């Protein structure tokens, strides 16, 4: 089975330098911590996708703050070849309550940026590092 396509990923910024992570319940990367996100549906923009996927996976309504970047992920994991082109966005919660989607998510965790798990899915560690090392100091200071 192969997976290929455009995806959208969210860094959900919470108070006190925390972000929200999800533990994947599906392959590839089953059991790995990840940023919420998923595949872009036909006729959908990446911005619409990130808002929809966060709501589906975590129960949170979010607003997009800014785009972190565009990425290319390619590899084989759990016997599955994948090639994704994710757009990563910084988002903030504006409503809803944290509630995991049973089908795709094993667990939801609030993680401090200083204590991010080493075992992350896809290129999510790079996305988090890009967020932490943002060129804009005002954006970095918005963590607190």
Language model: regions and residue ranges:
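NUDIX/MutT-family hydrolases
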Residues: 90, 99-130
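A generic structural micro-feature
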Residues: 2-4, 32, 79-85, 102-105
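Active-site-adjacent beta-strand/loop module that shapes the phosphate/pyrophosphate-binding cleft
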Residues: 72-97, 131-132
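A short coil-to-beta-strand element that immediately follows conserved catalytic motifs
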Residues: 60-70
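Short, charged/polar surface micro-motifs in flexible loops or helix N-caps
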Residues: 13-19, 28-29, 70-74, 91-96
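Charged phosphate-binding loop/patch that engages nucleotide di/tri-phosphates or the phosphate backbone
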Residues: 125-144
